[in-house]
C-alpha cells in the first residue's frame, strides 16, 4: 500500500475519517471551482444573458458529472472491498472493469448530449437570448467527457486505496489550468460561454492523464496486464457486472438529484431573468456549502466498503455512526457561515441589481438553514448504504428527495397553491427530511440483522 494510503480496518476511526475527508473537501471544492470560475468570468465578461446561459448549462454539467462520479464510484466501492480483503488480483480486475465502463459511459454521454441539448433547454424554457450559449456549453462538455470519466475512474481507485492526497494534487493542477484558460478563452479569444466549456474539458483531460499514470506506477492493482487472463477464474463480464451493480444505482441516484435541480430551474425560468439568475447563483453557493458533506460521505463509503470486505461489520457500523455525527457537526458550522455572509457571497458573483441580490439572499436564507442538518444525515446514511452493499436504498432515497419532494412539492407550492418562486425555495429546503429518516431506519435495521 502506498505511503499516501489509509487503511480503515485498523486504528482510530475518527482520525482516519478526518485525515481522508480533509483532502476530499479540497478536491470537491476545486472541482466545483470549475463551475464557479466559469460563472464568475462569464458573469463579468458576457453579463446577465451569459450568466443565465451558464446557470442552465451548469445544471446539465452537474447531471453529467453526477453520472460520471456515480458510475465510477461503483468501481471504487468494489475496489475498496478487495482492498479490505487484501486481494490485489481482485483490485486489478475491478479497476479494469471500471475503466471499460467509463469509456462506454463517455461515448453514451457524447451521443445523448449532442442529440438532447437543444430540445432539453427549449423545453426547460431557457430565455431565447441565452439558449445558444447553454446549448454550446453542454455540447462541448458532453463531447469531451472521456477525460472526466477516466479521471474519476482513476480517482475512485486511489480513494478506494485510502489515498485522498493524490487526487487533490491532480485536481489542483487541473483547477489552475481551468482558471488560466477561462481568462483567455471567454474574453480575449471571444468564445464567451463556450470558451468556459472548453477550459473545463481541457483541464480535466490533463488531470485524467496524470491520474492514470499515477495509479499504474504506485499500485500493483493498477497495473492492468493480465487482469483478465485466459487462465483466470473470473470472466470480464462478471467484473463489469459487479461494477455496474453498484455503479448504476449510484450514477442514477446522483443524476436524478441533479436532474431535479434542472427541472426546478425550469420552474424558476418562468419567473424571468432576474429570478433565474438569482437562483442560479444561490444554487452555486449552496452547492459549494455542501462540499464538506460530500467529502465526508465519500470517506464513509470507502471506510464502510473496506471494513465490509474485511468482515469487520461492527467497525463498519461505527463508521456510519461516527461519520454521520462528524458530518452533521461540520454542516452546522457551514450553514451558520452562509447565513452570516449571504449578501457578500451574492455580490461576489457579480449580482448588483437590488431585486436580483435580494432574491439570491432569500434563496440562501431558505435553502441553507436547518434543512442542512437533515441533508448531512441523509448523505451520511446513503454513503454507508452504498459502501455496505445496498445501492438500491440509495437510489430509492434519491428518488424521494429529488422528485417526490424537491420537484413535486415545488410544482405544488409554486403553481397549484400560488406561493410563486418562494414555494420552490421551500420545497428544495424540505427535500432531505424524509430520506434522512429512512436512512436512520436502514442503519438500525442493518445493525440488528447482523447482530452488531
Predicted regions and their residues:
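Short alpha-helical transmembrane segments in multi-pass integral membrane proteins
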Residues: 1-21, 79-146, 177-180, 188-248, ...
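N-terminal transmembrane alpha-helices
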Residues: 8-45, 59-74, 78, 103-110, ...
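Transmembrane helical elements of multi-pass membrane transporters/channels
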Residues: 19-38, 140, 144, 151, ...
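Transmembrane alpha-helix boundary and packing residues in multipass membrane permease domains
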Residues: 24, 28, 40, 77, ...
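Helix-terminus/linker motif at the lipid-water interface of multi-pass membrane proteins
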Residues: 29, 33-52, 121-128, 184-191, ...
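Small-residue hotspots at the loop-to-helix junctions and early N-terminal turns
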Residues: 46-59, 134-138, 197, 273-288, ...
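Small-residue-rich hydrophobic transmembrane alpha-helices
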Residues: 51-111, 148-167, 278-342, 375-397
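Transmembrane alpha-helical segments of integral membrane proteins
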Residues: 378-379, 405-414
